[in-house]
Amino acid sequence: LFISTRFGNVSQLHLVKTPGGARKQVTYFDEPIGSVTHQPNGELIAFTMDSGGSENAQIFKLNPNDGSYKLLTDGESRNGGPKWNKTGTKIAYRSNKRNGASNDVWIMSIDDPDSAEMILASPDGTSWGAIDWSNDSKKVLIQNYISITDSRVHIVDVETKEQRLVLGDPDKKSVNSGLGFDNNDEGIFYITDEFNEFNNLAYKNLDSGKISLITGDIKWDVDGFALSKDKKRAAFTVNENGFSSLYLLDINTYKYKKVSNIPIGLVGGINFNDQSKMLGLSINTHQSPSDSYTLELKRSPLSYGKLTRWTDSEVGGLDTSSFVTPELITYKSFDDLEIPAFVYAKDSDDPLPVIIYIHGGPEGQSRPGFSSTFQLWVDQLGAAVITPNVRGSNGYGKTYLGLDNGFNRENSVKDIGALLDWIDTQPNLDSSRVAVYGGSYGGYMV
């Protein structure tokens, strides 16, 4: 299992051969490595890394067996998002090499950097990037991100450079996040909010145009997806009121099942191994930073076995068993809108001072993950910490997301005023001692 972690000054790639085993460092760069993706049915790794915080990331290929590596991009432009084709011979990636500004999409033979060619020139200042290759490597699925409420998906023919819009509409805003081709290149899986309030998992047949809504019964956002290499099953994650749930999906029937043996927290980085018999994932809880796990998969697409923890991240000697568990609450704002928030507080005979932490964004979301800062405030300052998700926060539907747009911006500030009123009604909280903390948009709110 390859993991990215930081023992020295910056994050590097490590190899863990057994659950709980020692980590063998694979890379030794002065700069932190960025994204990492493994060659299908091969040994090479493609990864990104910039220099001196320039954010002009380059793409490298690495042989983890001997540590040898090679720069694939030009060393000057900004590059990212490498996606392997199914045979592991090429990558598609985004680059601003053409003019230093536009995010174009390029492809390259992994053995010949000089073969790099642009297959899509960005016509505007929006973000474009490769999502997936077709199984025959003749087409590339490409994401065009315009805003948090507007995104589209195109297919580009590698040889002719012909571009086809397959998801989204320039005249109607909707979220359309491409995920990948099916096993016959007949259709694509994607996430969309076109049909209801939330980001749903869906499938579109490319010939007929028929759309199958897969998770319409789940009234929360799907925020992660992985398709097994044999393309018989998939896994997806759902953001349920800030907490993550993991599901397995039968590709043939579109039936899905929640995985029950996942710790309460945040799940990310889901990915199947090449044999489609194991699902890798990272789990972050209020007591542990992100650690790597694997889920055993059985023959039936919806059957699974043991969850195995591979890493146990160090926390600098902190006693995480003393960390308080965040409690999900809601309170009413000035217009009776229910505002969700997480409360971190110890039991106390006396009312606790309060620190209100306001997230950035504005379309961000406070979630109950690992936070040594919040736990420090609770333990050392004796304070309660409240993290509200005021109107305009992501994760609660597109109507809620848009409630602070334009002249309604100050209504989100009023949500903090309503939180102060709520604090005043709580016997365990001291409304005369309240601090407000935030950065970026949260700083504006402060």
Where are these regions (language model features)?
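Serine-hydrolase catalytic core recognition
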Residues: 268-446
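Multi-bladed beta-propeller domains
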Residues: 16-34, 52, 61-78, 98, ...
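Beta-strand-rich domains and repeat architectures in extracellular enzymes and scaffolds
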Residues: 1-14, 36-37
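Short, low-complexity Ser/Thr-rich regulatory SLiMs
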Residues: 95-96, 192, 343-347
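Blade-terminus and WD-like Trp-Asp/Gly-His loop motifs, strongest in beta-propeller folds
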Residues: 1, 36-44, 82-90, 131-140, ...
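A generic tandem-repeat structural signature
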Residues: 39-102
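Short, solvent-exposed loop/turn segments at conserved positions within beta-propeller repeat blades
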Residues: 6-11, 52-57, 97-103, 146-151, ...
